[in-house]
Amino acid sequence: MDGQSLSSATPLIHHDHRNTWWRCHLQLKNSLSSELSGAVGDLGTFIPIVLTLTLVSNLDLSTTLIFTAFYNISTGLLFGIPMPVQPMKSIAAVAVSETPHLTPSQIATAGASTAATLLILGVSGLMSTLYRFLPLSVVRGVQLSQGLSFAFSAIKYIRYNQDFITSKSTSARSWLGLDGLIIALSSILFLVLSTGAGETHGHNAPSRSQDPVIDDDNDPRSRGSRSSCVNKRLRILNSIPAALIVFLLGLILCFIRDPSIVKDLKFGPSKITLLKITWEDWKIGFLRAAIPQIPLSVLNSVIAVCKLSGDLFPDRELSAAKVSVSVGIMNLIGCWFGAMPVCHGAGGLAGQYRFGARSGWSVVFLGAGKLVIGLLFGNSFVRILSQFPIGILGVLLLFAGIELAMASRDMNSKEESFVMLVCAAVSLTGSSAALGFGCGILLFLLLKLRKMDYSTPSFLTPKSSVDDELSSIP
């Protein structure tokens, strides 16, 4: 009887698996408002690069919005976390900063070359091997340098007017005006008060019940009442979709700054066609843009984003092979039609998480918004982007960069911190994640060699039965 009742009460295994997949991929992990707020958390990087490529290299904005929309939707559903879709930054930098500027066809070949490399690394298993054996301190150094680089750029956006066509800061930003310092600083104040230092949103808000408000008050009921009020206030503040409100404020200011935008908007997307690509385009795109982009994509778009996903979502750590294949497939589909080369960046994941994104639905909502805009306004949407307050973009980018940099705080030894900081310093000084990565690996190996016992090689040392027994203990 007991066995029968037990078996009848036991849920089926395949039913549990379906429920697990549903919970991981198709359920909201946070409130709808927080997921929507997190969706715009990486636009501080996305908008400036898209705007620059559109103005300088004649990137087809409509095609880019439509394809990146499908990327967002598909990766959000497949990975079950707020997987970002961001521009390939090195390709974008080469395209607009070097002369002559890269053409859309050359940008496409650079993206396709990078994508093919990542696809091969992912399918062959080499990316998983690299991810498994790469020292954590080196990865943290790459993350720290990328986060600080975002933060430095963000401060420039906030303090100075920007000329995205020349990729340079111009005059100091004025205090007043619709893109003045007061707007930017007010946005920072609002985000800090509503989101704090990035504590967990919703019902997991941090509790301070152990800390009495007044030291000489020893009444437990009084302390409990005050801590309850504090927790209630924190829950209310955390429930505010802060980043979404700041972003919507920026959109409203676009139309106030230049009311003629409304007349310039044209309905309907541009025609999606295959690019005409020559062998010369392949040569220029690969040599000038793909070669510097490939190591950055391997480190930041795959290795760093997988490590960060394990930090933020311990039960949903990403597979390096799957992420690498994802980047490859996205670009090998979209680049032929002139879509901007994209990747999965750790900075984007940090930014979206920072403002409340906890599930794949966050980027699904973002993708739906991009799709509507791309189909409704097409290339004319660039008029709105060109008037978006740069100071507000800087604020969003600042919080994303700091969140990414804070992932490096888990170094437990001085040796790990030493490797991480050297890697970050070289990356920032040389403006090359690959250079910092190489120096970090070399330093890591030197430190290991320094502590190695050279008196008797380990493979010549006889191994006792006790050693065998100890090694078998898990």
Question: Where do the language-model regions lie?
Answer:
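Short hydrophobic alpha-helical membrane-embedded segments
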Residues: 39-46, 62-67, 84-88, 178-186, ...
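Transmembrane helix-boundary motif of multi-pass solute transporters/channels
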Residues: 37-102, 312
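Transmembrane helix boundary and interhelical junction motifs in multipass membrane proteins
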Residues: 44-48, 84-92, 302-304, 339-348, ...
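Membrane-embedded helical hairpins/re-entrant loop segments and their flanking transmembrane helices
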Residues: 18-36, 52-74, 289-361
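Transmembrane alpha-helix interface/packing and boundary motifs in multi-pass membrane proteins
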Residues: 37-38, 73-83, 291-295, 329-339, ...
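Short, amphipathic, aromatic/basic-enriched membrane-interface segments that mark the entry/exit
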Residues: 32-40, 53-59, 76-83, 171-179, ...
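Hydrophobic, membrane-embedded alpha-helices of multi-pass small-molecule transporters
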Residues: 32-37, 41-43, 174-187, 242, ...
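Membrane-embedded alpha-helical modules
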Residues: 99-261, 365-474
